[in-house]
Amino acid sequence: ITDLTVGYQLYQNRELDELELSESTLTTITSDTSNAYNDQLCEKRPTKYAYDFHFNFYCLNSDGTPNENWNKAVANRAFRRCFQEGLNLIPYYARFNKINPLKCENNYYTMKGVCYNSKGTDYVDLVAKELGIDGEKYDGETMVHLRKSTADSIAALKKQAMDELTAIGVTFPVKAPFFFVAGNTVAQDNATVLKQCFTDSFGDDFIQLELGTYVSSLAKEVRIPKLHGFVINGWGADFGDPVNFVGQEILHDDNAYYSWYYSNSAKVVEAGPADWQKDL
């Protein structure tokens, strides 16, 4: 059911056993403990996929010309660090789990207990150490990546990114093209909440989501034409094989589908990196 207003009416009439809720309906129910449906909410079953932001380093405009403003911005390490260290996604997580939003936080490609190195160390623990979040656990209150961040540290990182990018001709706010399927109220609500997360985290003078829609195929209408600033995609195949997934992201051979059609980093290498792409 793509029209959740109609779906909610069907649920109220006992014509449906379960239903995903629109953002407005969910907020209405959760904000009132006496609501008739407040005690009927339950967490959805987790999927087997690891969902991640996938940046596009070779974004094009609709006319096929390079989106230089975004491409220069996303190539900057301080700019990307703002996503990792300053973007509060709890309201967005709540779109998928209103009861325990932070259960949706995903810091790794691979789950714990899946693979170990020759010394018996869990692969996830090795990654956590590299990320500086070793030992951090779910607490139901804060995102792991934001625990070491302060308002001052994020303001300084934002200023660094803006100063470095202004010097190479980037104008602000940087628009990040983000697409959702047309006619789907859930997808529209998700995108709207995500856009607000950027506003709440950084203000409107730095990064803004530029929302767009596609009709039926994200791949054919958005990814292959390279129109996205980033996409959120789930990795499910070979979930226990981190080498395969990392290879998909960073290698440039013909089989590295992600680097050719998601990040387009292989295109950058093929064309020859510009001076401002040296960090990549």
Language-model regions, residue ranges each:
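Append "and occasionally in soluble cytosolic enzymes with long acidic Gly/Pro-rich linkers
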Residues: 74-200
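Extracellular/periplasmic solute-recognition and catalytic clefts
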Residues: 1-63, 94
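Short helix-loop capping/hinge motifs at secondary-structure junctions, enriched
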Residues: 59-79
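Extracytoplasmic/peripheral linker and loop segments enriched in polar/acidic and small residues
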Residues: 72, 79-81, 85, 89-96, ...
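Extracytoplasmic/secreted cell-surface and envelope-processing proteins
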Residues: 7-9, 27-31, 53, 62-66, ...
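Extracellular/periplasmic catalytic domains that process cell-envelope and extracellular macromolecules
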Residues: 46-48, 76, 169-172, 222-226
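Structural recognition of the beta-strand scaffold that forms the well-ordered cores
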Residues: 17-21, 51-56, 82-86, 93-94, ...
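Periplasmic binding protein-like
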Residues: 11, 16, 21, 35, ...
